[in-house]
Amino acid sequence: MCIRDRNLHRLKKGWDVKMDLKTYTTGIQHIGIPTNDIEKTIAFYQKLGFEIALQTVNEEADEKVAFLELETLVIETYENKAAKMESGAIDHVAINVKDIEEVYRYIEAEKMNTTKDTIHFLPFWDNGVRFFTIEGPNKEKVEFSQYL
């Protein structure tokens, strides 16, 4: 029985599950930077060598969104007209995960979901993404995100 199956079995039995979160993560997926002018932001990062990996609209939030890629670094920038435009402008760091449900259960079991966030879906990329966000001890946002 693999670790994942064993942990699912333990969860179903109501047992304490000490899961290694590293089993379900593959690294940083992207860094989120809000902007008041997405075209200016895209142009700036293109001058640094970034290429547009995806440009779309988050219709739910009425935001223009662009994912900009330079080698293995991906920046998600989104125009929300509420960016503070000051130092510390990074909004969140997203960790790429293989199984959003397992990670969510782990975060809940460890009582780390201080924001009480739930798993959301956005129709980005080919098949969409599912994600949720927690808050770290310094008020930083940590997003867990799975490409579908």
Question: Which ranges hold each PLM region?
Answer:
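Short, solvent-exposed loop/turn elements at beta->coil junctions and helix N-caps
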Residues: Q55-N58, N80-K81, I119-F124
